[in-house]
């Protein structure tokens, strides 16, 4: 049990009595950090959550964004970190299953998955094992349920050796008049439990996720990891959507963390009603299960529909058709209590508000002094450093990962993995751009600028594809919130994220907090993994690859002396200190709006490529454009707009925010330049078969040999 003495006293003060074993187990689950957000809730409330395109912000299983007159997107992001550290294949698979159920719970059909993954160094055998089996778990689950995995990111850093991060984003499509919510508004409606049967797996999964891992966790906590079943999930998905299409459903919610306890209590509390649950009606996978085990089980692939009794027969016929189990397990009642019965005997009787709305905590915060010193290094020759940087697993091609994913099932994918963002078709005119991003070194060095930078980079990625950013989702991965310095990092990160989201009118509509990501004193780098959804006219889509010899290369934005905290410093110099790149929000906003305006007015397609500058700086961004297009370029480094005189390596590896590379048809350069009123310079031309950076030349083959096959060699 993880209930503290003060929480026990609070609970018993409200009840006016002692809890029995079942009640204590139910409340232990609901008071866990994972379910209650008791440490983070006061801080999360500072996020901007409303906007003109937002139908629903945080509070339900997913957020909702309007994309056309007819359609909305359901968008969510979840973590499955602790389970994946213990059982990587199953932990990753059940993470996919959970976010898919969240999207289905809004009435939407899942159309895309994205993943944001972090592991220790690939020189470490345990990290390789976790990486291999997490990717396998995501691949097997996503491919078998028929939902494409279209984008994502992977980082390798020693801070994640014992605490890998498995964050998954899902997007679903729903007609606006078919949206449902996680509510139980009508007394007399019944709870129809459908999907998989209830077993002993996952009991106390949420309390396990609300504690630090230890060296014994791999054996002691394995029973808390749920068992994935993608084949049942596919049937549950189709049956759920058919029920929603055929029946007037009052509400629906998936059974994830906290199992039936969490699902039922949140359904009725949202509608200020009560619930009665009859345990004897719940389909069980194992014999001899106790009420405690039944109510706390986190067995996968289960959903609860709130429906009128007259619709039960129709709903169960649909379940039978899809060969999944279903049963009426209770009803919505007057009052505000959740009552658990078994053969007429009341086993638990708890106020729903006590279960679904535990008190938040006002934990201590302690500021960490930021390192603002200038980090001086001896730069190796650019010929050496760029090829070495391209062969770093953090920069190198992630084809080993995404080739295992089916990214074209459902035939909506317009731009595939490997670009700034994935693009999916919604209808003949409308597409959406999707991306996930994080920069854990920046966030470690400066939580505010790191948090702001994560949102800004994700927004630049969708803008580079021609899409207007509509909304943000997140997974906020941190250490122990009981440590004042950790909670200060968390607060400052959210303040930075909020600054950018608010200025771009891209509210935070859904997300997840994962605390306690540390093992015996080893803490992860603070990791705000950010997903952004952008919407665009299909005609505005651009990609990063160089297209035509003779095109002029323009760099929009100013380059600052901001190489500290960069991939260059981490990879080439093994340094992770100094000042992180700062967010200059006015410039970030102006430059982003400039790109969108240029693309919107470019009916002749004179702008042929767009790419943002981020990890690895200008040198890596240009290398990617060369390799993608299989055509070289010549860059005049002296033409780049800078804040001051910079050494060559500081210039090409700076990770200053707010910068975009665009290529323009030579005949249209003057026309395009006349439309730009932010810092811009012609820095080169697309030509030949080499990348020429000042006096440094690289053949396309050299770049490809460094960039491709890196992860494959580690995993061979």
Swiss-Prot record:
The keyword Transmembrane does not apply. Coiled coil: none annotated. GO terms for cellular component: cytoplasm. The keyword tRNA processing does not apply. Mg(2+) 1 binds at residues 78, 512. Substrate binds at residues 79-82, 101, 226, 298-300, 514. Keywords: ATP-binding, Cytoplasm, Ligase, Magnesium, Metal-binding, Nucleotide-binding, Purine biosynthesis. ATP binds at residues 37, 474, 511. It catalyses: N(2)-formyl-N(1)-(5-phospho-beta-D-ribosyl)glycinamide + L-glutamine + ATP + H2O = 2-formamido-N(1)-(5-O-phospho-beta-D-ribosyl)acetamidine + L-glutamate + ADP + phosphate + H(+). GO terms for biological process: 'de novo' IMP biosynthetic process. GO terms for molecular function: ATP binding; magnesium ion binding; phosphoribosylformylglycinamidine synthase activity. CDD domains: PurL_repeat1 (cd02203), PurL_repeat2 (cd02204). Part of the phosphoribosylformylglycinamidine synthase complex involved in the purines biosynthetic pathway. Catalyzes the ATP-dependent conversion of formylglycinamide ribonucleotide (FGAR) and glutamine to yield formylglycinamidine ribonucleotide (FGAM) and glutamate. The FGAM synthase complex is composed of three subunits. PurQ produces an ammonia molecule by converting glutamine to glutamate. PurL transfers the ammonia molecule to FGAR to form FGAM in an ATP-dependent manner. PANTHER family: PHOSPHORIBOSYLFORMYLGLYCINAMIDINE SYNTHASE SUBUNIT PURL. This is Phosphoribosylformylglycinamidine synthase subunit PurL.
